[in-house]
């Protein structure tokens, strides 16, 4: 009987083949009726689903999507308050708020970029370009020069009264550079220019302290005893919101000690002044001094 059923002249593709399904949903390619059911049942729902999908995307972009609430849950959703509302006492002109609240909520610039104690980026670039031209160096050489000048300023400060030369070590040899191009082109001040080097100088001091005890000369003059505060012991350190309270107090005390005893005058002595009045005082040998004629017979004290 088996031989009667078998067709030895069978050719591939000439007959239909039947595949039996195992009942597992994992084999979706063999389910011939599944796709037809999807097509008949979901034809009217496709536009609605696409619209709801677009609406959900728009809601996620706006950020106003509320939380899904279960049908069986009870209670109310906790409201969220806005950071800045129009009910605040905001500046207005003609009854209209002049602030852009949406922009204000996103405007979070770097704090140090707004400090007026730091030279602007344009001023710093102008200073760098002027020093580069007067020293007649390229960018690679200027990188080495800036390293040496930063370390020199850590120990010697950034006073506007500095003059002469600054030195940089090349092994055991001292190399001198004139200070005039650096000081004259520093606008507004040299200290405001050097505030751009604050983080690099702090990291350099930490690196030196990790190898051996290192205290900048500014801290030695102020008699700073805590070596943990050595990283703040230079006069162009930029105090920020991240500066610890103890470090801020030490910086203020060192600055007060550095400024103690300094008497600055707005006007100096004018050398272009001559006295036009004539002195007509007459003195004799019996006068006590040039400002006193006589003591009525009394002699000078013995």
Curated annotation (Swiss-Prot):
Residues 28-46 have a biased composition (Basic and acidic residues). InterPro entries: Poty_coat. The keyword Transferase applies. The record marks 21-22 as: Cleavage. Genome polyprotein of potyviruses undergoes post-translational proteolytic processing by the main proteinase NIa-pro resulting in the production of at least ten individual proteins. The P1 proteinase and the HC-pro cleave only their respective C-termini autocatalytically. 6K1 is essential for proper proteolytic separation of P3 from CI. Residues 47-63 have a biased composition (Polar residues). It catalyses: RNA(n) + a ribonucleoside 5'-triphosphate = RNA(n+1) + diphosphate. This is Genome polyprotein. It comes from Watermelon mosaic virus II (isolate Australia).
């Amino acid at each position: 009987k088996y031989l009667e059923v078998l067709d030895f002249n069978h050719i591939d593709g000439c007959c239909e083949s039947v595949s039996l399904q195992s009942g597992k949903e994992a084999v979706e390619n063999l389910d011939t009726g599944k796709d037809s059911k999807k097509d008949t049942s979901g034809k009217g729902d496709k536009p609605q689903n696409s619209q709801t999908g677009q609406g959900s995307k728009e809601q996620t972009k706006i950020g106003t999507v509320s939380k899904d609430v279960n049908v069986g849950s009870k209670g109310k959703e906790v409201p969220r308050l806005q950071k800045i509302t129009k009910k605040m006492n905001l500046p207005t002109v003609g009854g209209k708020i002049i602030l852009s609240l949406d922009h204000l909520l996103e405007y979070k610039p770097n704090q140090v970029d707004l400090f007026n104690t730091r030279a602007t980026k344009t001023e710093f670039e102008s200073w760098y370009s002027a020093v580069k031209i007067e020293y007649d160096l390229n960018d690679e050489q200027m990188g080495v020069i800036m390293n040496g000048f930063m370390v020199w300023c850590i120990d010697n400060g950034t006073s506007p009264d500095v003059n002469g030369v600054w030195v940089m070590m090349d092994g055991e040899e001292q190399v001198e550079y004139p200070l005039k191009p650096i000081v004259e082109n520093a606008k507004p001040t040299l200290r405001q220019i050097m505030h751009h080097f604050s983080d690099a100088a702090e990291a350099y001091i930490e690196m030196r302290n990790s190898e051996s005890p290192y205290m900048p000369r500014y801290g030695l003059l102020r008699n700073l005893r805590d070596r943990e505060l050595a990283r703040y012991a230079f006069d162009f350190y930029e105090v920020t919101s991240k500066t610890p309270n103890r470090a801020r107090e030490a910086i203020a005390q060192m600055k007060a000690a550095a400024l103690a005893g300094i008497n600055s005058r707005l006007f100096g002595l004018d050398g272009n002044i001559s006295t036009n009045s004539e002195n007509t005082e007459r003195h004799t040998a019996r006068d006590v001094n040039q400002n006193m004629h006589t003591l009525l017979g009394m002699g000078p004290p013995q």
